[in-house]
Amino acid sequence: GMLFTATSLFSQVNISAGSTVTQNFDGLGTSATATLPTGWKVDKNNSVRSVGTYSGAGTATELIAGNNMSSSAQNGIYNFGAGVATSATDRAIGGISSGSASKSVNVYVQLTNNGTTSINNFTIGFDVEKYRNGKNSAGFTIQMYYSTDGSTWTSAGNDFKVSFVADANTDGYTSAPGATTSISGKTLSQSLAAGSSLYLAWNYSVTSGSTTSSAQALGIDNVS
């Protein structure tokens, strides 16, 4: 069975050996300035493929989008809806770059081992959903990172990377998301002692180079 454990007394997501944590972001609701679930944070910066710090990140989105996302959509942090942005119940979190801003959007979670035994490794899955095409020739990627302190990050590698190749246009989708790629059951070989925290970050950015115009809009969903 799936168990999402969080407490209002602490700002992290609690986990213990053998337990499962899931998050589908549907609790975001339909507000552009939606508050993230406990233990989750988000930020944006103007450097490509750059992860910030968990402590410095915020706890709310800035914008919403869903069906028919505009080719001139504002850059920033999005609460995406699978369907009509203002009413869809299935939500995801992510963003979109412009040529000069939001070159990276990062979604973070702090996992704290509140059990009595060490966790030897983590089995992780997540979906990457595409809410708008982008004709930037490099394409866009979501890459997961991990950290023991929330500020120094290590790439989790290709098993935790989803890239989309360039599209012919920057159109939205009549029925969003227009594409979904799932990462399922991949092992992150990182131990976590009782009482300690592990931080994960999902970085959205252009796949290569530094040109971020004509971007694809990507979000993450169904983290487990």
List the predicted regions and their residue ranges.
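Bacterial N-terminal signal peptides
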Residues: G1-S8
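Boundary/junction segments of secreted and surface-exposed precursor proteins
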Residues: S8-L28
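Intrinsic-disorder/low-complexity, polar/charged segments enriched in Ser/Thr/Lys/Arg/Asp/Glu/Gln
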Residues: T20-T22, S104-Y108, N121-T123
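Short, solvent-exposed loop/turn elements at domain surfaces
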Residues: S31-L36
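Surface-exposed, low-complexity/disordered Ser/Thr/Gly/Pro/Asn-rich loops and linkers
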Residues: N45-T117, L218
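Short beta-strand elements bearing conserved aromatic residues within extracellular beta-rich modules
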Residues: I142-M144
